[in-house]
Amino acid sequence: MAFMGRELKWGVAHIYSSLNNTIIHITDLTGAETVSRWSGGMVVKADREKPSPYAAMIAASRAAAEAMDKGITALHIKVRAPGGHGPKTPGPGAQAAIRALARAGFIIGRIEDVTPIPHDTTRRPGGRRGRRV
């Protein structure tokens, strides 16, 4: 498939964004071959800055540069929050990571939320009488 005169090579950007960190993992279309992987904790010194939008933006731009070097020109984006018992909404770094990938020059295909949501709910930790503080 060509877009504006150039041939497209598609990849998938898996963005996992929690309240503690943001992980950007770029793979080929099958998801089997890792092209690039960066996290907020790899680009900042202080632990408290790992979930920040700034850390996500820097991690995404470094992952994008690595993927561009390997020939990826277009991306589908899959955003994931912790889900399950944890929060169902992505952390503060998700939006910044998506914007950084778009600004890096990739053609963006689909943006999809792949947060695991239980349909019947598994048992929460803490037992029958709850967590006693």
Curated annotation (Swiss-Prot):
Print the keywords alphabetically: Ribonucleoprotein, Ribosomal protein, RNA-binding, rRNA-binding
Extract one GO BP annotation from the record: translation
Q: Name one GO cellular component term.
A: ribonucleoprotein complex
* Domain of life (superkingdom): Archaea
Q: Where are the transmembrane segments?
A: none
Output one GO MF annotation. Answer: rRNA binding
User: Mind telling me which InterPro entries this protein's record contains?
Assistant: Ribosomal_uS11, Ribosomal_uS11_archaeal, Ribosomal_uS11_CS, Ribosomal_uS11_sf
Pfam families for the chain: Ribosomal_S11
Function in brief: Located on the platform of the 30S subunit.
**Which family is this sequence assigned to?**
Belongs to the universal ribosomal protein uS11 family.
**How would you summarize the oligomeric state and partners of this protein?**
Part of the 30S ribosomal subunit.
Please identify the protein, giving its name as recorded.
Small ribosomal subunit protein uS11
Q: Which organism is it from?
A: Staphylothermus marinus (strain ATCC 43588 / DSM 3639 / JCM 9404 / F1)
Query: Lineage from the top down?
Result: Archaea, Thermoproteota, Thermoprotei, Desulfurococcales, Desulfurococcaceae
Gene it is expressed from = rps11
